[in-house]
Amino acid sequence: MAPISHYIGKTSLTTLAIGIAIGITVSNIVKFSSTQRRHFSSSGYIPDSPHSHGENDFVEGPDDSLSWHDEHSHSHKFENDSVARQLFKKVRVLCWVMTNPNNIHTKARHVKATWGKRCNVLLFMSSRADRDLPALALNVQEGRDNLWAKTKEAFKLIHSKYLETADWFIKCDDDTFLVLENLRYFLQDKSPSEPVYYGRKFKPIVQQGYMSGGAGYVLSKESLVRLVTQGIGHKEDCRADSGGAEDVEMGRCLQSVNVQAGDSRDELGRERFHPFVPEHHLIPDILPPDMWYWSYNFYPAKQGQECCSDYAISFHYVPPNMMYVLEYLVYHLKPYGITSAYESTEEQDHGSSHKDTDAMKPEGKGMEDKEDEETNISLAQTDSKHIS
């Protein structure tokens, strides 16, 4: 009969072996989980509310505005932008950017240095005038609780002074990135005399849906007129005080004056206006499955390659540095040997906005057209400089 100590020693060794095995297993699980979290982690901000604002206020950007000076480089020498210049004249867009005194130099000026210069008219709305940007001073208080008040005052000012300068009027934040060429392409077959507005359509609260404020929303001229002359100060559904979520209150007000919340998706059902940075839409599983975003989308939200139209218009929560990254990727980076053909803007029909069939290459640049476009841009910028 073996001594008791023999069994005790054998049991201890077995227990030790099992403990080591369990420890290794747990360690591997934790390590794998950590790796997966790193893989799906994001460098960008994920908002915990559909009405979050100011999350990039403390993200530092370049000390000075950046600009490219490669107009005469080999890659741009043979670039043909006549279609974009044609649409610049045909589809006039006024962009107004919601900002505040603290963001003028940290965020707003980087908007002006990138996509803002492609607006027919560019206005920055703040509570304090700034002649360098420039920014207009609205008689409102700052803070997220006053965004609806600022929005109402901005549209009233635009209706009063800038109604005839544009056909479409887009509102966005100072951390929104817009591709104006794609916005004009989307709007070019639509009438500014129709009561409609477009953006990223959310579905709670407002019966017909409403557009995400951060992704930007664009009003036709008729919609702007109805908003100011029939809605604000006239309808119960147009909230009189400064409270409420800006985009929700805008949706309620526009619905009350029979402005339709339009569908901005492309013919494949992919969205054009995006409430987050590209990474959050393109990479699956970055956004938590229990996040508000999934239940707020009017149309089923898609992840990965099906998330975004090839002619995407906007992205939100874009920090200053990323403004320049997107500017480079959209307007400067080119795959050598690949050229694009464009569908005739006269023949495009609604709902098939980027067919490859019946495509045509644009005509070559004309110096007179180029000078006309530069004049339009200069007038818009000059107008902005003298409004504050």
Swiss-Prot record:
Keywords per UniProt: Disulfide bond, Glycoprotein, Glycosyltransferase, Manganese, Membrane, Metal-binding, Nucleotide-binding, Signal-anchor, Transferase, Transmembrane, Transmembrane helix
Basic and acidic residues biased stretches: 347-368
Binding residue positions for Mn(2+): D173, D175, H316
Catalytic activity: an N-acetyl-alpha-D-galactosaminyl derivative + UDP-alpha-D-galactose = a beta-D-galactosyl-(1->3)-N-acetyl-alpha-D-galactosaminyl derivative + UDP + H(+)
Broad class of where this protein is predominantly found: membrane
Disulfide bridge positions per record: C95-C119, C238-C253, C307-C308
Function description: Glycosyltransferase that generates the core 1 O-glycan Gal-beta1-3GalNAc-alpha1-Ser/Thr (T antigen), which is a precursor for many extended O-glycans in glycoproteins.
Full protein name: Glycoprotein-N-acetylgalactosamine 3-beta-galactosyltransferase 1
Source organism of this protein record: Biomphalaria glabrata
Source organism phylogeny: Eukaryota, Metazoa, Spiralia, Lophotrochozoa, Mollusca
